[in-house]
Amino acid sequence: MKKIRAAVVGYGNIGKFSVEALEAAPDFEIAGVVRRQGDKDKPLELEPYEVVDDIQKLSNVDVAILATPTRLCPDYAEQITKLGINTVDSFDMHHFILDYRKKQMENNKRTETVSVISAGWDPGSDSVVRVLMQALAPKGLSYTNFGPGMSMGHSVVARSKKGVKDALSMTIPLGEGIHRRMVYVELEDGAKLEEVT
C-alpha cells in the first residue's frame, strides 16, 4: 500500500502533536516540516525529517496539515492548494468558517484538490458529538462547557499584538455553556497597556 505523504506546516503545539500522530499512523509518512526559520535551530526530534521554510522545497507532498495560527489558515490553504496539495486544518474562527469554506471550495475546484477545514475540537469533533447528542435526545439541553484550562488559540492571538512579550488566555466555565475568558499579558519593555488593549 502506498503511504500518504504529509507535510506539517507550522511547528507549535499543534505541529508537534501532528508529527507525533503521523509517526504513529501506519498509512502515513512525513514528507517534511515547514517552519519560518527552516532547519535553523532544528529541534532534535525532527532530525529524521526534512525541515524547510517553504513547502515547495519538499517533494511529493499529498497533504499539508496546517498547524499555523488559525487566522493564517485561509491564506496558507489557498497558496498550498495552488501547488496541487490537499490541506487539513483546525480553523476555529466560527464567524468566518462559511466564508472560508466558500472561497476555499472555489480554490479546490480550480486546482482539483481537497481541503478539510475546521477539523479540530471546536469546531470539529466536539461539534459532531453535540449534534449526535441532540439527535439522540432532541428535548434535552445540549450545553458545551469548556475549561478550566488554557486556550491555545486565544493565547496566540494575544501574543500577536504589538507590545506583548508573552500572553496566556484561560477559559473558566460558568455553566450552561457560558464561560469567562481571562487574559494575562506580559508587556515588552516600554509598551503601555492602553496601547495593547
Briefly describe each language-model feature range.
Residues 1-29:
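NAD(P)+-binding Rossmann beta1-loop-alpha1 motif at the extreme N-terminus of oxidoreductases
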Residues 9, 13, 17, 135-197:
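Active-site-lining helix/loop region of Rossmann-like oxidoreductase modules
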Residues 17, 24-45:
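NAD(P)-binding Rossmann-fold cofactor-contacting core
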Residues 37-54, 156-157:
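N-terminal beta-loop-helix "entrance" segment that forms/cooperates
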Residues 51, 87, 114-115:
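Hydrophobic beta-strand scaffold residues
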Residues 53-82, 94-98:
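Beta-loop-alpha module in the N-terminal Rossmann-like domain of NAD(P)-dependent dehydrogenases
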Residues 91-115:
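Rossmann-fold NAD(P)-binding glycine/threonine-rich loop
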Residues 111-152:
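Adenosine-phosphate binding glycine-rich loop
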